């Protein structure tokens, strides 16, 4: 949705729903329907000062479409003020935290907790999947809404009107009221009680039972005899136990507040200290690791403790929140798996869904019901002709390996996403997939060994992936102008010459598997932003890549000399393959580059000006990170020998721009760290190279927080590692660290330690007096060690 202009004259603010550090949220109603751009009459509007606004929350919300997540309608800029207005679904309900505070002992029954956790598991599996990769980063009871289903009238204090008690409201009204105390209790009218509007009243405990949920009701000894509340049996007002009654009729939550959420790419790093401190995972609180999808899992465990009445400020000896004793063994185990200190060993949501604390039958039913409306996946053995009506209303189809039947036009009119198995090699007929937006062909597909007819690929198609065998020409008009992404798998046969006009001007992503044809100027469209040239590509680049490309990957065989016109001027990400070893003279790399990756063969000296100041991430890859290349044994041996004979090239301040914050150096680069040579703002260093002396002060900058030294084997001195470092790795599986007595010299800021030592040195009780007590995560030879050392479970 485009940005709107928010006009106060078009909205009536009905109530304030909440306030926070960044703004406030109000309930608002349209009073002038013309020109608002919002089709919903009542919205929740988040109002944020433009000075603190980022588009992050909007970009996240636009990706989400799930019945258990708050809906996003659009956003606008204030017409007369300096605010941003985010229009969202108004949720008729209350935060779980509000209901929790009304409960005896501030805790929910475990069966209710389990139901809420199931909904949260469904939400997390949705936002964490590989399509969205979203981290919520603030999961807690305040951000979980229990939603009214408009069939039961019970207010936030538990006054249940279905049996005529507690409230004068009728049964078809909201069980979450916003009326004043007098009106709810039946002791006043709207005219004479406007002054007390929206006040809350204490929980009333009375005798009897709620007809809705069957909960026992007890007498409220403090209630006045003059109260005009409705009565049951003995004439006393009634209140049900809130959570049992409300959840039995609601059966639905919604997750809100994605203001702190982030997208991630598996290893994405977010060092910012955000979230709620009581629910914050250690990797975020200590700023020594990455905020990842598993960070939400820690918060899920804390949220369960919160709903169970636990005190999140009360920690055990490991720094984890204490789990309430009254919970079942199954629930406790579920929480323990959420609260694993090391995120690398913490369960993800897919593993937790299989835990016996979760009702797997309900999970399966929810997922199956969702999939049944949109997706069908066939077994590998299926190989029957699809008939008209077989796949009506199906949006996604995945065929197994054996399927190899012609798709008859009219049989897949609703299918938007289709994936063929490895055996499929029938010609794609015109109008056979009229609505498809994404098509993936298997390994043997070659379109019946003939080019596509114009119109065979539908005008709706946005993404096509070809397997290994496809090698047919693309004449102008074959690929539709709707196409955004075109992928040829690595190792595939496609190697046809691409002519001007064969690729539509709409393409933004092009991945050419093992393509090795010279690309003439004008062949690649100016819409292209992501280009990957496969492993076999080794052609000159000058003038062939459009200026629009911002991400460029060159395959392992590429080793052509570069000039100033080779790399596009807007390129931000540039990756060279393993073979590249040409000079990078000043001016070759544009000043737009932020991430540069050099392969393990690169061994040229970097002089001042070789690397632009825009670079923030520089990676020297080493052989272990490369895929196997098609050298024969002799070539590999000679290549390694040549590298070993080259002189050692020191890293110098002139060769590394000050802007770099992340640096990885491979073991074959023959570079060594020298005094004060690393960029001053460096935060993360992975160093596979050797050392010719111990680290001394100022070798590592004071900005650095994460250091991995795979071949370091000198004594650690108090000044060797800066106090800013909270995460450290010493040694590797092939290069053990033997100076273990010096580990006691770590500064107190160190939290995360990973070491590889000789098996003879692994004596836990000897290490007890060496490893500092401040360490909260310890991994020895790849195994996670329980802390503190020497404490038996």
Curated annotation (Swiss-Prot):
Residues in Protein kinase domain copies:
11-358
InterPro entries per record: FNIP, Kinase-like_dom_sf, Prot_kinase_dom, Protein_kinase_ATP_BS, Ser/Thr_kinase_AS, STK_FNIP-Repeat
- Which reaction is catalysed here? L-seryl-[protein] + ATP = O-phospho-L-seryl-[protein] + ADP + H(+); L-threonyl-[protein] + ATP = O-phospho-L-threonyl-[protein] + ADP + H(+)
- Tell me the ranges holding the FNIP repeats: 403-444, 470-514, 515-557, 558-601, 691-733
Gene3D superfamilies from the UniProt entry: Transferase(Phosphotransferase) domain 1
- Binding positions for ATP per the UniProt entry: 17-25, 46
> Of which family is this protein a member?
Belongs to the protein kinase superfamily. STE Ser/Thr protein kinase family.
- Any idea what this protein is called? Probable serine/threonine-protein kinase fnkA
Q: Output the lineage of the source organism.
A: Eukaryota, Amoebozoa, Evosea, Eumycetozoa, Dictyostelia
Gene this chain is encoded by? fnkA
């Amino acid at each position: 949705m485009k940005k709107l202009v928010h006009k106060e004259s078009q909205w009536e603010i009905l109530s304030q729903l909440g306030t926070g550090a960044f703004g406030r949220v109000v309930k608002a109603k349209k009073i002038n329907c013309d020109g608002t751009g919002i089709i919903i009459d009542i919205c929740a509007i988040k109002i944020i000062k433009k000075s603190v606004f980022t588009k992050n929350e909007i970009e996240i919300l636009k990706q989400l479409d799930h019945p258990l997540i708050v809906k996003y309608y659009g956003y606008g800029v204030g017409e007369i003020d300096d605010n941003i207005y985010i229009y969202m679904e108004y949720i008729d309900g209350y935060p779980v935290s509000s209901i929790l505070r009304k409960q005896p002992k501030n805790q929910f029954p475990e069966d209710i907790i389990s139901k809420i956790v199931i909904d949260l598991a469904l939400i997390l599996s949705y936002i964490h999947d590989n399509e969205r990769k979203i981290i919520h980063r603030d999961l807690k009871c305040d951000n979980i809404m229990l939603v009214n289903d408009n069939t039961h009238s019970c207010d936030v204090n538990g006054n249940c009107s279905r049996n005529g008690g507690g409230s004068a409201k009728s049964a078809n009204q909201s069980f979450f009221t916003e009326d004043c105390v007098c009106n709810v209790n039946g002791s006043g009218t709207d005219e004479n009680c406007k002054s007390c509007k929206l006040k809350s009243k204490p929980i009333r405990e009375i005798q009897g039972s709620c007809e809705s949920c069957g909960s026992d009701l007890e007498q409220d000894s403090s209630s006045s005899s003059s109260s005009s509340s409705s009565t049951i049996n003995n004439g006393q007002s009634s209140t049900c136990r809130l959570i049992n009654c409300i959840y039995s009729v609601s059966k639905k939550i919604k997750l809100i507040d994605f203001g702190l959420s982030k997208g991630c790419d598996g290893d994405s790093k977010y060092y910012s200290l955000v979230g709620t401190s009581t629910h914050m995972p250690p990797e975020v609180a200590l700023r020594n690791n990455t905020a990842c999808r598993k960070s939400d899992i820690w918060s899920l465990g804390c949220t369960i403790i919160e709903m169970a009445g636990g005190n999140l400020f009360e920690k055990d000896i490991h720094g984890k929140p204490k789990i309430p004793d009254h919970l079942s063994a199954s629930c406790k185990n579920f929480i323990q798996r959420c609260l694993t200190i090391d995120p690398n060993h913490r369960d993800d949501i897919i593993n937790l869904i299989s835990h016996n604390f979760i009702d797997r039958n309900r999970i399966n039913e929810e997922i199956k019901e969702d999939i049944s409306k949109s997706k069908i996946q066939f077994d590998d053995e299926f190989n029957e002709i699809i008939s008209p009506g077989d796949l009506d209303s199906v949006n996604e189809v995945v065929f197994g390996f054996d399927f190899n039947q012609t798709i008859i036009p009219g049989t897949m009119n609703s299918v938007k996403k289709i994936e063929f198995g490895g055996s499929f090699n029938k010609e794609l007929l015109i109008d056979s997939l009229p609505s498809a937006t994404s098509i993936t062909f298997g390994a043997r597909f070659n379109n019946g060994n003939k080019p596509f007819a114009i119109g065979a690929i539908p005008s709706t198609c946005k993404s096509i992936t070809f397997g290994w065998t496809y090698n047919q020409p693309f004449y102008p008009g074959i690929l539709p102008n709707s196409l955004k992404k075109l992928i040829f798998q690595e190792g595939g046969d496609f190697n046809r010459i691409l002519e001007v006009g064969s690729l539509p001007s709409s393409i933004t992503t092009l991945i050419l598997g093992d393509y090795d044809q010279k690309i003439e100027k004008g062949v690649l469209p100016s819409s292209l932003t992501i280009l990957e040239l496969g492993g076999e590509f080794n052609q000159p680049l000058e003038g062939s890549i459009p200026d629009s490309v911002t991400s460029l990957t060159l395959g392992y065989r590429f080793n052509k000399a570069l000039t100033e016109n080779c790399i596009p001027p807007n390129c931000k990400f540039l990756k060279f393959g393993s073979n590249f070893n040409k000079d990078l003279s000043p001016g070759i790399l544009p000043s737009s580059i932020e991430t540069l990756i050099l392969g393990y063969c690169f061994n040229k000296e970097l002089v001042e000006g070789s690397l632009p100041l825009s670079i923030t991430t520089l990676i020297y890859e080493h052989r272990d990170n490369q895929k196997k290349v098609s050298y024969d044994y002799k070539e590999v041996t000679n290549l390694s020998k040549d590298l070993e004979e080259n002189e050692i090239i020191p890293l110098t301040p002139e060769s590394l721009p000050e802007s770099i914050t992340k640096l990885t150096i491979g073991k074959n680069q023959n570079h060594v760290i020298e005094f004060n040579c690393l960029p001053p703002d460096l935060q993360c260093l992975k160093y596979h190279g050797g050392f010719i002396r111990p680290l001394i002060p100022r070798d590592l900058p004071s900005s650095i927080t994460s250091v991995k030294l795979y071949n370091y084997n000198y004594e650690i001195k108090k000044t060797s590692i800066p106090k800013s470092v909270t995460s450290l790795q010493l040694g590797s599986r092939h290069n053990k660290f033997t100076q273990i007595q010096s580990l006691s010299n770590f500064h107190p800021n160190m939290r995360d330690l990973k070491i590889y030592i000789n098996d003879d040195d692994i004596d836990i009780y000897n290490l007890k007096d060496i490893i500092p007590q401040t360490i909260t995560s310890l991994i020895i030879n790849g195994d996670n060690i329980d802390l503190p050392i020497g404490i038996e479970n």
